[in-house]
Amino acid sequence: MRLLILAVGKLKQGPERELAERYRARFDDLGRKLGFRGLDVHEIAESRAREAPARMAEEAAAIIAQVQDGAVLVTLDERGQSLGSTAFAAQLGRWRDEQVPGTIFVIGGADGLLPELRRKAKLSMSFGGATWPHQMVRVMLLEQIYRAATILAGHPYHRA
């Protein structure tokens, strides 16, 4: 199963980008041993439309254009379900074992995600009730994906 993060906005050079890349590389090393075929991050350009609904619609169209048939769509949204690390790992493991071709995680821009896009998601996840900057959400998601791989591998990184 291939993993893809579609993130609206660009992560500039700096500590957040370095940390995100570190977790992505760690996952690649471990994930391949677990049957995952890699983890990619694609940045979606932020819309320049004047009104929020138009921005969300443009960003949603760019996101949907990258969703492959049969892939599981997971949105990151403050209204989503808060999953513990072990539950998240178990879900990724189930999708892998069901031979889902890919899982696509979507991180919206400043205006959030178009409701129609949220409805297409098999799972909507939240990192708690707080609103987080998309740069932090990307790092947090990459860390949780890496942590999920360590849980599936029985690696001591996750000490619950």
Curated annotation (Swiss-Prot):
Transmembrane segments: none annotated. GO terms for molecular function: rRNA (pseudouridine-N3-)-methyltransferase activity. The keyword S-adenosyl-L-methionine applies. Keywords: Cytoplasm, Methyltransferase, rRNA processing, S-adenosyl-L-methionine, Transferase. It is found in: Cytoplasm. GO terms for cellular component: cytoplasm. InterPro entries: Alpha/beta_knot_MTases, RlmH-like, tRNA_m1G_MTases_N. It catalyses: pseudouridine(1915) in 23S rRNA + S-adenosyl-L-methionine = N(3)-methylpseudouridine(1915) in 23S rRNA + S-adenosyl-L-homocysteine + H(+). Its EC number is 2.1.1.177. Its main location: cytoplasm. S-adenosyl-L-methionine binds at residues 76, 108. SUPFAM superfamilies: alpha/beta knot. Specifically methylates the pseudouridine at position 1915 (m3Psi1915) in 23S rRNA. Belongs to the RNA methyltransferase RlmH family. Homodimer. This is Ribosomal RNA large subunit methyltransferase H. The lineage of its organism: Bacteria, Pseudomonadati, Pseudomonadota, Alphaproteobacteria, Hyphomicrobiales.
